[in-house]
Amino acid sequence: SDSDVPHTRGAAGIGLVRTETAILYDQSDEVQTTRLRELLKSAEGVPVLLRTCDTRADDDAPWAGETQDRLRGNRLFKPQIRALLCAATDGDLRVVFPMIKDVADWDRCVDEVNTCRDELLAEGCETGPMMLGCVVDMPSAAVMAGDMMEHGAQLMAVDIEDLTRYTLGLVQNPTAAVNQLTNP
C-alpha cells in the first residue's frame, strides 16, 4: 500500500541500511542483488543509503571472527560490491564503507568497486551508478575526511557512537567495560 512507501510518509530517503545479517545468511551475489533490487524498487526513487558489511575486531557477535577473516580474503566484500553495482540500475543507491582508517583504505575500496564494475561489464552485466562514501567511525577518518573527499568520497555518514567510543578508548563489550573501569 501507499502507506508502506517511504516518500508517502514524508521520507526523503532510506538509511542507514545495515547489511551484515543479510550477507551472513546468503553470501551469493545473485541473492544479494535480488534483495537489493527489491529494496530499491520499494523505495520508488528516494535515495537508499546502505552500509557495506561491518565486521569489527571488537564485535562480540558470534560470526565476527570468521567474517573478519573472510572479509580480509575478499570473499564477502567482492560479492557484496558486485550485487550493489547490479542492483544500482534499479534506484538511487548510495553506499558507505565502514572502518576506513585512512586514504589508503578508502582508495582500496574504490579500486575494488572499479574492478568489480569492469568484471561485470566484461561479463555483459549492466551496472548502475552509485554515490560512494565512508562511515566516519574512527578518529583517523574524522581527521582525514577532507582528504578522502579529495580522493573522491561523495558523502560521509558519522557514526557518533563508535566515533566517541574509539576516541575515548572505550570497549564495546559491557563486561569488558566494567573490568576496564574496575581494574585500570
Spans of model-derived segments:
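Conserved alpha/beta-domain cores
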Residues: 1-184
